[in-house]
C-alpha cells in the first residue's frame, strides 16, 4: 500500500486533479516548522491512513475535510457546503457590519513601505496656530471673533442637518426657488435678474417641450453657440459611426445573445458562478452578498481566460469584478515554485493602495501573496517583497518600470494576466510611453483586462494594448452617473468670477458642513484654499501631487476618521477612490472635460447610497456643464440649481480679501520652513555619503527608458490632458518679428501713439514743417534747387529722417 500512497502524493501539485485529500495534505505539509520531527509525523500519518483504509473508515475522513473548509467535487457535498454558506450570510443580515468595516482605507500595506526617515513635514495648522498665539499675545482679537462666528454658523448648519430626515433633504427648499433659465443659476442680485428677464423669457419659450418635470429639475441653458455645437457633434457622430462600427465588429468578439432567460438567473449570486469556498468566504468577510451587474457579467467571462473590456458607472464594484476571477484562477496554480503571474496597473498611488487593500481582504482565506509597488514608498522594502516572487503585483506604471529595469530579482517573463484599471487614463498621452514600454516587455500570450467608468470606444487606442478578440462588457450607458446622485449647479454671472472663493466658503460654512470633497484644477489653488479654510476656522486637509506619500496618507486618514470635514484635492483623487461616507462633492470650477467631471462626482453616491455634487460654474465652464446636464437628462437623473444671495458671497469674498496679507505671510513662512527642512536633509545626505561612501559608489546606477527631456514632455502632455493647454506660446528665444509685435503691443497699452499716415510718407503733412525747421538749423545740406537728395547719395546704413 505504500507505493500507492506515494503516487497520490506525486499528483498533489497538478492542475487537473481534484481530490480534496491531496489539497489538505499539501497544506499540512507546509505548516510544520520543525524539520527534525517531519519524518516521524509522516510515518505516523502513513500508518494511521493504512489502518483506516483496512478498516474502511472513509466517512469520518470526509467529515474532517469538510470541517477544515475545503470541499470535494461530489454533488452531494457541494450542495451541503453551499447551503451552509448561504446560512452564514443570512445570519449576518445584509453584511452591513462587514461592509462598514471594509470601506475604510486600508493603509497597512502602504505603511509598511514608508521610508523610515525622520523628515518632518511643514504643517499649515501649526503655522496658523503659531500666528494666532502671536496675535493673542499682542492683543489682536479679531481672528478669534471671526472663529466664533464661523463656529456658530457650523453649529446652526449641523442642527439643521439633525432636524432633517436625511443628510441632503434639507436643501430641497432652496431647490424650489431656483431660477427658471436653462442653466439653472439665478441672478446674483435684483439688478442682474431684472436685466436678464428678456433672455430668461426666451429661454423658457425654447425649452417648453423639454421642461416636463417639476420645478426642481433644471434644463440645459440655450446659448447662441449651443445649437451650432450640437449640430457639429451630431455630424461628427454620424460620420464616425459607420467606420467605428465596422472596426468594433472586426476587433471585439461577437456578443453572445442569451437564448433562454434562465442563464441570467444563474449569476444572481456568487455561489452560482462556481467560485471556490475560500473566495466565497473572502466575499463574505468584505460584505458582498450579491454581485453587481458588472461583476455578474465579467467574472464568468474572465474565468474562461478571455480578454475583457469592461465599463460601468463609478461605485459599481469594478475592482472586485477583476480581482475575484484573478484570485479564483490563482487557486489552481502550481505552488511548488513561487511565480509572479498577475500585474494590476493603476494610474495613481492612492488607487493602487486601495486596490491592494481590497485584494488582500478578498484573499484573506487563501495563500495568495501580494506586493504593492508604487512611488513614494521604500524601494528596498519593495525589492525584498519582489524577491519572494509574489503572485500578484499591484503597481503604478512608473515604479513597475523602475523595478523591471533595476531590480535583479524581478522578472516579467512569467506574467499571465495584465489588468489596467482606469484604462482610459492609462491610454492618454501622459502614460502612453510608459504603457508602451511595459506592453513590449511582458509576454504577448497573456490575458488582458481593461476597466473604466468612461471606457474609450476608440478601437485605435485599444489595439495598442494588444488585446486578442476581447469581450466588450458595458453594463451602463457610457458617460452616465449613478442614479442616486443629485447634481447641483451654481451659476456665476459675468463679472463675478472673482467671487468664486466666497461662494465656496458660504457653501462649506452653511450648507455642506461635513464629509465634503472639494476638487480644484491646480495644486496651488488647493493649497491656497487650505490656508483660507484654516484661517476661517474650517477643518480641512489637502491632497495633491506636491505632497509626500506620508502626507497623503495622513491627510486621507484625517478625513476618513472625521478629524477633518473637508478634503481639498486635485484630480489626483478623482479616480477610483472609495472613501467611506462622502456625502457631497464640490467642484470649485468645472474640469477640463466631461469624463473628468464624471469621475469627480463619482466619489459620492457609491454602492447605491445617495449623494450630491455641486459645481460652481462660470461662462467658460458652459461646455462641460452643458454636456453634464444633457447626459443627466438622457439618463433621467436629477439636476437642480442653487441660488446664493450675492450679499452672502460678497461678505465672504471681503473676508478673503482681508486675509490676503496674512495668506502671503503664511506662504512665506511655509517656504522658509521648507528651505530649512531641505537644508537639514542635504546635511544628512552629505553626512551619509561621507560615512558610507564606498557602499554608495558601489551601487549600480538606476536606469530609465527615457531621457529627462522626454520625461518632461510626457509630463507636460499629461497636464494638458487634465487642464488643457497652459501658457499657449512656447518659451524660448524670440525672433525679431515677435519682438516687434511685443513692442507694438506695449506701446498700444501705454496709450495712443501717433503713427505716420500716407501724407507723412509722401513728405507732406506734419513732417513737412519739421523738415523745414531742420534745414534752417543745419545738418546735411539739401540737394540742388532745394530738392530732396538723390537716392544714390544715400548709404545703406543711413537712417531715414
UniProtKB/Swiss-Prot annotation:
A motif (DEAD box) lies at residues 421-424. This is ATP-dependent RNA helicase drs1. Residues 503-682 form the Helicase C-terminal domain. The gene is drs1. Keywords: ATP-binding, Helicase, Hydrolase, Nucleotide-binding, Nucleus, Ribosome biogenesis, RNA-binding. The lineage of its organism: Eukaryota, Fungi, Dikarya, Ascomycota, Pezizomycotina. Residues 1-10, 735-770 have a biased composition (Basic and acidic residues). Belongs to the DEAD box helicase family. DDX27/DRS1 subfamily. It comes from Botryotinia fuckeliana (strain B05.10) (Noble rot fungus). The keyword Ion transport does not apply. Gene3D superfamilies: P-loop containing nucleotide triphosphate hydrolases.
Amino acid at each position: 500500500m505504500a507505493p500507492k500512497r506515494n503516487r497520490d502524493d506525486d499528483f498533489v501539485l497538478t492542475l487537473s486533479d481534484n481530490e480534496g485529500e491531496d489539497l489538505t495534505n499539501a497544506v499540512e505539509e507546509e505548516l510544520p516548522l520543525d524539520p527534525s520531527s517531519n519524518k516521524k509525523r509522516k510515518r505516523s500519518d502513513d500508518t494511521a491512513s493504512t489502518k483506516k483504509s483496512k478498516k474502511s473508515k472513509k466517512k469520518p475522513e470526509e467529515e474532517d475535510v469538510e470541517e477544515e473548509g475545503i470541499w470535494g467535487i461530489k454533488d452531494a457535498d457541494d450542495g451541503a457546503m453551499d447551503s451552509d454558506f448561504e446560512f452564514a450570510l443570512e445570519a449576518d443580515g445584509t453584511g452591513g457590519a462587514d461592509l462598514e468595516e471594509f470601506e475604510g482605507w486600508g493603509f497597512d500595506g502602504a505603511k509598511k513601505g514608508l521610508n523610515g526617515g525622520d523628515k518632518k513635514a511643514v504643517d499649515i495648522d501649526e503655522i496658523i496656530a503659531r500666528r494666532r498665539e502671536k496675535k493673542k499675545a499682542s492683543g489682536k482679537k479679531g481672528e478669534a471673533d471671526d472663529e466664533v462666528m464661523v463656529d456658530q454658523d457650523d453649529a446652526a448648519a449641523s442642527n439643521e442637518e439633525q432636524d432633517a430626515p436625511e443628510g441632503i433633504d434639507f436643501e430641497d427648499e432652496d431647490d424650489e426657488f431656483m431660477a427658471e433659465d436653462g442653466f439653472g443659476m439665478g441672478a446674483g442680485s435684483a439688478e442682474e435678474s431684472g436685466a436678464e428677464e428678456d433672455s430668461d423669457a426666451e429661454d423658457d419659450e425654447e425649452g417648453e417641450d423639454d421642461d416636463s418635470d417639476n420645478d426642481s429639475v433644471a434644463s440645459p441653458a440655450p446659448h447662441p453657440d449651443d445649437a451650432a455645437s450640437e449640430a457639429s457633434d451630431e455630424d461628427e457622430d454620424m460620420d464616425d459611426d459607420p467606420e467605428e462600427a465596422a472596426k468594433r465588429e472586426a476587433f471585439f468578439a461577437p456578443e453572445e445573445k442569451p437564448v433562454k432567460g434562465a442563464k441570467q438567473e444563474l449569476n444572481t449570486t456568487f455561489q452560482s458562478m462556481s467560485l471556490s469556498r475560500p473566495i466565497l468566504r473572502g466575499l463574505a468577510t468584505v460584505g458582498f452578498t450579491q454581485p453587481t451587474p458588472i461583476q455578474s457579467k465579467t467574472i464568468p467571462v474572465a474565468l474562461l481566460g478571455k480578454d475583457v473590456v469592461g465599463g460601468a458607472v463609478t461605485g459599481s464594484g469594478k475592482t472586485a469584478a477583476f480581482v475575484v476571477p484573478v484570485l479564483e484562477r490563482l487557486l489552481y496554480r502550481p505552488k511548488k515554485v513561487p511565480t509572479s503571474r498577475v500585474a494590476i496597473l493603476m494610474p495613481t498611488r492612492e488607487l493602487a493602495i486601495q486596490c491592494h487593500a481590497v485584494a488582500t481582504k478578498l484573499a484573506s482565506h487563501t495563500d495568495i501573496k501580494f506586493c504593492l509597488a508604487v512611488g513614494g514608498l521604500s524601494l528596498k522594502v519593495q525589492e525584498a517583497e519582489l524577491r519572494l516572487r509574489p503572485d500578484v503585483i499591484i503597481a503604478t506604471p512608473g515604479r513597475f518600470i523602475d523595478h523591471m529595469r533595476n531590480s535583479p530579482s524581478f522578472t516579467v517573463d512569467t506574467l499571465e494576466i495584465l489588468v489596467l484599471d482606469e484604462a482610459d487614463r492609462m491610454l492618454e498621452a501622459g502614460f502612453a510611453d510608459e504603457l508602451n514600454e511595459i506592453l513590449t516587455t511582458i509576454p504577448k500570450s497573456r490575458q488582458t483586462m481593461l476597466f473604466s467608468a468612461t471606457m474609450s470606444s476608440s478601437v485605435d487606442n485599444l489595439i495598442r494594448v494588444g488585446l486578442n478578440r476581447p469581450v466588450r462588457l458595458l453594463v451602463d450607458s457610457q458617460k452616465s452617473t449613478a442614479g442616486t446622485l443629485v447634481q447641483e449647479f451654481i451659476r456665476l454671472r459675468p463679472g463675478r468670477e472673482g467671487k468664486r472663493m466666497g461662494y465656496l466658503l458660504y457653501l462649506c460654512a452653511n450648507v455642506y458642513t461635513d464629509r465634503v470633497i472639494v476638487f480644484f484644477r491646480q495644486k496651488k489653488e488647493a493649497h491656497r484654499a487650505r490656508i483660507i479654510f484654516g484661517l476661517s476656522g474650517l477643518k480641512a486637509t489637502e491632497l495633491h501631487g506636491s505632497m509626500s506619500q506620508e502626507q497623503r496618507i495622513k491627510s486621507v486618514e484625517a478625513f476618513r476618521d472625521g478629524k477633518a470635514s473637508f478634503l481639498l484635492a486635485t484630480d489626483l483623487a478623482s479616480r477610483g477612490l472609495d472613501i467611506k461616507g462622502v456625502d457631497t462633492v464640490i467642484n470649485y470650477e468645472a474640469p477640463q472635460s466631461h469624463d473628468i467631471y464624471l469621475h469627480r462626482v463619482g466619489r459620492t453616491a457609491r454602492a447605491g447610497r445617495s449623494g450630491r455634487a455641486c459645481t460652481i460654474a462660470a461662462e467658460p465652464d458652459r461646455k462641460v456643464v452643458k454636456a453634464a446636464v444633457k447626459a443627466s437628462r438622457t439618463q433621467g437623473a436629477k439636476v437642480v440649481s442653487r441660488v446664493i444671495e450675492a450679499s452672502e458671497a460678497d461678505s465672504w469674498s471681503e473676508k478673503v480679501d482681508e486675509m490676503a496679507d496674512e495668506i502671503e505671510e503664511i506662504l512665506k513662512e511655509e517656504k522658509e520652513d521648507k528651505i530649512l527642512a531641505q537644508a537639514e536633509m542635504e546635511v544628512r545626505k552629505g553626512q551619509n555619503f561621507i560615512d558610507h561612501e564606498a557602499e554608495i559608489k558601489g551601487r549600480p546606477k538606476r536606469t530609465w527608458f527615457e531621457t529627462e527631456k522626454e520625461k518632461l514632455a510626457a509630463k507636460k502632455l499629461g497636464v494638458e490632458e487634465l487642464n488643457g493647454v497652459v501658457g499657449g506660446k512656447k518659451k524660448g528665444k524670440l525672433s525679431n518679428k515677435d519682438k516687434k509685435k511685443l513692442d507694438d503691443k506695449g506701446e498700444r497699452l501705454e496709450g495712443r501713439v501717433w503713427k505716420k499716415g500716407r501724407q507723412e510718407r509722401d513728405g507732406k503733412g506734419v513732417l513737412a514743417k519739421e523738415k523745414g525747421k531742420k534745414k534752417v538749423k543745419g545738418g546735411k545740406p539739401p540737394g540742388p534747387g532745394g530738392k530732396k537728395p538723390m537716392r544714390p547719395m544715400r548709404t545703406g546704413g543711413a537712417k531715414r529722417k
